[in-house]
Amino acid sequence: MSPQTETKAGVGFKAGVKEYKLTYYTPEYETKDTDILAAFRVTPQPGVPPEERGAAVAAESSTGTWTTVWTDGLTSLDRYKGRCYHIEPVPGEEDQFIAYVAYPLDLFEEGSVTNMFTSIVGNVFGFKALRALRLEDLRIPVAYVKTFQGPPHGIQVERDKLNKYGRPLLECTIKPKLGLSAKNYGRAVYECLRGGLDFTKDDENVNSQPFMRWRDRFLFCAEAIYKSQAETGEIKGHYLNATAGTCEEMIKRAVFARELGVPIVMHDYLTGGFTANTSLSHYCRDNGLLLHIHRAMHAVIDRQKNHGMHFRVLAKALRMSGGDHIHSGTVVGKLEGERDITLGFVDLLRDDYIEKDRSRGIYFTQDWVSLPGVLPVASRGIHVWHMPALTEIFGDDSVLQFGGGTLGHPWGNAPGAVANRVALEACVKARNEGRDLAAEGGEIIREACKWSP
């Protein structure tokens, strides 16, 4: 019998409960390039020292349990355990601190966001010794990044497919999002695309309801796409939501979209789940479909400031799981601090290499190596007068989504689309000429109105 598995009755082991910090708090630990690093915002129960709570997070999200078990002797805890290696207070917050935890790469299945989250956040958030816990950021090592396909195509390939360069893309969600027949829905799609938008979009909760079954919607939207392409000479698309109750049904809808020859489908990646999302992403790459991602349900996870997960973590996970676009919100009208934080995770979506910058909420330097980038989608209550700020803040590699800002135009859908396209092209032209969009934005839009049909 192997010495490692041999039962030694005369030796035994020291059973019982012991403090987590004795095993899992290791301030002397030097992190490895292959470690997954996590930054947790911890709010402990009163009277619990930070070192113990940080170590508890590391233990309960890796190899630990509430008591010592004899099977600990059958493996190497030093190789597999998570380690809380640094603790720092949160400025301006009483009794909150950031616990930094390092996880050995062997704890995670290759290419599985599902397994990564199951390990890191699957159980520890219900730990009664903590009042609240929030995952602020993750550092994904290059060795783990390379096990993921990532976005089906990425920013450059999408631009090449669409033959559209040098400006943000324009998009509109069809409203009302529920209740339209498939034919009337397709009519609205045609009017918006014919007016000058690049894309229209299913709302996140449009799947296959009694008033509009998915196959009918796909057919009428495809007709609208082809008609608007023939009349404008531009490549158009509609985000056909393939989200369904089963993975098999989701793939069936994506297959039908491919057979129709449309360029893009859509998925609700949080409600649909990471396993389904990764499967759809792989299908889209293999079959030449772009993949738009909606983040429905994200606020359930990321809205609380001291519990849950920050959206930057969900954004990183999406880039690994796969998607060519994802909604990122917008910074127009928000506080400057929120602007910096939002643009921080926008850079995490688009760029290849992002330096640590705590002022923007980036706790770790992240190297994505060759993983394609994701286009952020700016949405939520924006309209044509926001165009100068959006053009300046988000730059060319973005999608600007005007729902009510298109369909709410007093002259109708097509004029609303025309207004957005004219405003965008005017702002891009002014920017390229060196004009100050922040100072002259209103004047630029008014000048464009004079020549708009």
Curated annotation (Swiss-Prot):
Which GO CC annotations does the UniProt entry carry?
chloroplast
Task: Give the catalysed reaction(s), semicolon-separated.
Answer: 2 (2R)-3-phosphoglycerate + 2 H(+) = D-ribulose 1,5-bisphosphate + CO2 + H2O; D-ribulose 1,5-bisphosphate + O2 = 2-phosphoglycolate + (2R)-3-phosphoglycerate + 2 H(+)
What's an example GO BP annotation here?
photorespiration
| InterPro entries xrefs | RuBisCO, RuBisCo_large_chain_AS, RuBisCO_lsu_C, RuBisCO_lsu_C_sf, RuBisCO_lsu_fd_N, RuBisCO_lsu_N_sf, RuBisCO_lsuI
UniProt propeptide residues? 1-2
Quaternary state and interactors: Heterohexadecamer of 8 large chains and 8 small chains; disulfide-linked. The disulfide link is formed within the large subunit homodimers.
For this entry, the protein name equals: Ribulose bisphosphate carboxylase large chain
